[in-house]
A protein has these predicted regions:
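Condensing-enzyme catalytic core mediating Claisen C-C bond formation in acyl metabolism
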Residues: 1-54, 156-228, 232, 236, ...
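Short beta-strand segments
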Residues: 11-14, 85, 115, 139-146, ...
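Short acidic, glycine/serine/threonine-rich loops at helix termini
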Residues: 22, 93-95, 152-156, 323-326
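Acidic-glycine-rich active-site phosphate/pyrophosphate-binding loop
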Residues: 31-40, 91-105, 141-148, 203-211, ...
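Claisen-condensing/thiolase-fold acyl-transfer catalytic domains that form or cleave C-C bonds
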Residues: 54, 58, 62-65, 69, ...
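Anion-binding (especially nucleotide phosphate/pyrophosphate-binding) glycine-rich loop
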Residues: 73-107
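Short glycine-rich phosphate-binding loop at a beta-alpha junction
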Residues: 77-85, 249-258
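Flexible, glycine-rich active-site loops centered on histidine and acidic residues
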Residues: 133-167
């Protein structure tokens, strides 16, 4: 008797973005920029912003998970584990995943957050898959969500044009039909940590009048260095996963890259030899939602996917962190 290895398959996806749309034209009123400048350099036309008092990332995550449970006809009490990838948790502790778990009534699940910046969703997806493949968990929810507006300085024209709020969630279940996550590669390099970071607010540099006056609770990044590193690492790791699995570009249905900057995405796809028709983009609508970009692509483009399609996910983020996942889509939408 042949025993097939259990794989971890995505059985449903759902996304959420706030109602408020912040356009490039509105940003022209806040900083010295233009719609043309933003679109040319980033590909972004608008982004969503979560408004209202006491509205944190858990609000986005809860919307995603409630929609996912309804869509997949799943009872919250069936969920074994919830992992939330985010760099904008509601608070240092408890975890945002813990707060979401309570909101949705997942009384039988345990939960935790993963912090790997823009690579967070891939880190969380790879982590969750191990519990499924080990046979110890049947239903795991992975969330990628961020309220980036909470750490963006809207007087900094280089950064404020890039980021938006939003996220998505996926349900992982066991599969024995060879669909699901086939392989993943995750990497990190702490030597680049200071190039893309939040300088204050942690135990090393707690909040103070000085850190607030110095605006150290907002995103800091060295743009040109990040651009070069991101293109190199995203392309290298995607090529590595293709080589490891004997995949050529003609066998790839779609590349789903982290939506940081259209120029980074174009350069990465070009390095991989993948044509623009196979590269999924929604950055023009949402900007960079950090851990939310790839699950939002799942949500936006789900109807394109057919069972057995080869998908390559690729991301790069602060840390530095980067990674790639190769999966076979598990259902026809």
């Amino acid at each position: 008797m042949i025993i097939k290895k259990i794989k971890s398959s995505i059985s449903g996806v759902f996304g959420y973005v706030p109602d408020y749309v912040l356009t490039n034209k509105e940003l022209e009123k806040l900083v010295n920029t233009t719609d043309e400048w933003i679109v040319t350099r980033t590909g972004i036309k608008e982004r969503r912003i979560l408004k209202g008092n006491l509205q944190g990332t858990s609000v986005i995550g809860t919307k995603c998970v409630n929609g996912l449970l309804e869509k997949t006809n799943t009872d919250a009490k069936e969920i074994d584990l919830i992992i939330c990838a985010t760099v904008t948790p509601d608070m240092a502790f408890p975890s945002t995943a813990n707060l979401i778990s309570n909101e949705i009534g997942a009384t039988n699940a345990y939960s935790f957050d993963i912090s790997a910046a823009c690579s967070g969703f891939l880190y969380a997806l790879a982590t969750a898959s191990q519990f499924i493949e080990a046979g110890t968990h049947k239903k795991v929810i992975v969330i990628g969500a961020d309220k980036m507006s909470s750490i963006v300085n809207y007087e900094d024209r280089k950064n404020c044009v890039l980021f938006g709020d939003g996220g998505g969630a996926v349900l992982l279940e066991p599969s024995i039909d060879d669909t699901g996550i086939q392989d993943f590669i995750l990497k990190s390099d702490g030597s680049g940590g200071s190039m893309l970071c939040l300088k204050a607010g942690g135990s090393k540099k707690p909040a103070s009048i000085e850190t607030i006056n110095n605006k150290e609770h907002f995103i800091y990044q060295e743009g040109s260095s990040i651009f070069k590193f991101a293109v190199t690492k995203m392309a290298d790791i995607s090529e590595e996963i293709m080589l490891n699995n004997k995949l050529t570009s003609d066998k790839i249905a779609y590349l789903i890259p982290h939506q940081a900057n259209k120029r980074i995405i174009d350069a990465t796809a070009n390095r991989m030899g993948i044509g623009p028709e196979k590269v999924l983009l929604n950055i023009e609508k949402y900007g960079n939602t950090t851990a939310g970009t790839i699950p939002l692509c799942f949500w936006d483009f789900e109807k394109l996917f057919k069972k057995g399609d080869n998908l390559i996910l690729a991301s790069f983020g602060g840390g530095f962190t980067w990674g790639s996942i190769y999966l076979k889509w598990s259902y026809n939408s």
